Amino acid sequence: MLLGQVVALVVLVLGTAALGVWWSARQGAVRAPRQAPAGIDWASAGIALADRVTFVQFSAEVCAACRSTSRVLGGLTGSSSGVGHRELLVDDHLDLVRSLGVLRTPTVLVVDGGGREVARMSGVVSDTQARQALNRVPTAAAEADGEGQS
C-alpha cells in the first residue's frame, strides 16, 4: 500500500514539473497570428497604427506582467522610428478581445502598417522576444537593428 502511494506521489510531482516547464516555455513566445477577422478597422476602434509596425497590447488594470511587458515594448518603440505601442484595457475593448480571440493578459498583437496581424505573444514579453516579433516585419526589423547599433 505504501509503495503505491509513493509511486502516485512521484508521478504527480513529475507531471507538475513537466506542466511548469511547458508553461514557462510559452511565456512571451512569438507565435503565428490567429486568423484575424476580415476587415478590422483599427482606426474606428480608436487605435492609431504606426507607419511600419504597432505592438497592440491587451492588458488588465491589475496585472504585473502587463506593466513589465509595457516597459519592454515602450523601450523598443522609443528607439525605433515607425514602430508604435498601444496599450488597451480589455475591459474597455471587449468587442476586439472577443473578435481577436484574446484569452489572457498580456496579449500582444504585432500589426503591420497595413493593419494585418503578423505575430502574437502572450504572457511576459522579453526584449529578445519583442525583437523576434519585430523581425516578422522586415522593414521594421532592419530599422530597429540599425538604430540599436549606433
Place the predicted regions along the sequence by residue:
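N-terminal targeting signals for export/organelle localization
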Residues: M1-G39, S150
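Short active-site neighborhood of thiol/selenol oxidoreductases, capturing the structured segment around
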Residues: L49-E61
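The canonical Cys-X-X-Cys-His
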Residues: C63-C66, V108
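Structured extramembrane domains adjacent to transmembrane segments
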Residues: A65, G75, G84-L89
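Typically the conserved alpha-helix immediately C-terminal to a functionally engaged Cys/Sec
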Residues: R67-S79
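Thioredoxin-like thiol-disulfide oxidoreductase module
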Residues: H85-R104, G114, D127-P138
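Non-catalytic, surface beta->alpha helical segment in thiol-disulfide oxidoreductase systems
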Residues: V110-S150
